[in-house]
């Protein structure tokens, strides 16, 4: 008696899978041969009874997260009939309480016959099956992973391989250049100057390679007369250029022959050295 086509009032038959990945074409000419396992995405839903077709039913493939658009299985590894053969309970798994059709069927077929599934559905040995209808999949160990993370990692690895060379590291300021001229506008960066604000690192750099271009920057050279005049002017304005001193600063720059920003940098660099030497 065939029990797959009848429904019991006390037993609610679970809905048949709607995904095309659960369907498998019927097999013809089954005979006792080598065991040919099917991909995890296909089950023998066409079998009409416990004695039809033979074979064993392996892990349960029922998607318990279809309501939220995901994919999660219960971890049942093999179908175990809940009743004796010939009863309605024989089609229900005693471990996961799912219908037998949700379990992957491992049928017996001849190796020379045509494969009942397409070559694209074959999962290589050791590879984890990725279900196309859901961004989530579960590894054989039972842990839920997000498929997009692995896709992004694979895309990054492919881009790195296609590039042929790794990304160049950022150029760091050179620390080997220590022979500065005491007479230029970038001198005086010694002693207490290492503890001042970020203006020196932002506007002055750290040497010829501080900008990363490798080109040596132009440095202004001062005569001793210019240094003396700038020192006297800096003491007069208090080593700081304020708004009410703009006219005097511009007049001094025209007389000495230096630019305003050069004078400002020189005052900043020598404020903690020459300014503290005075009584």
UniProtKB/Swiss-Prot annotation:
Biased composition (Acidic residues): 1-13
Marked site (Required for DNA-binding) residue numbers: 267
RNA-binding in keyword set: no
DNA-binding region: 215-278
GO molecular function, one term: zinc ion binding
Region of interest called Disordered, as start-end residue ranges on this chain: 1-47, 157-191
InterPro entries: Homeodomain-like_sf, Homeodomain_ZF_HD, ZF_HD_homeobox_Cys/His_dimer
Function: Putative transcription factor.
NCBIfam families, A to Z: homeo_ZF_HD, ZF_HD_prot_N
Database matches in PANTHER family: ZINC-FINGER HOMEODOMAIN PROTEIN 2
Entry protein name: Zinc-finger homeodomain protein 1
Gene (name only): ZHD1
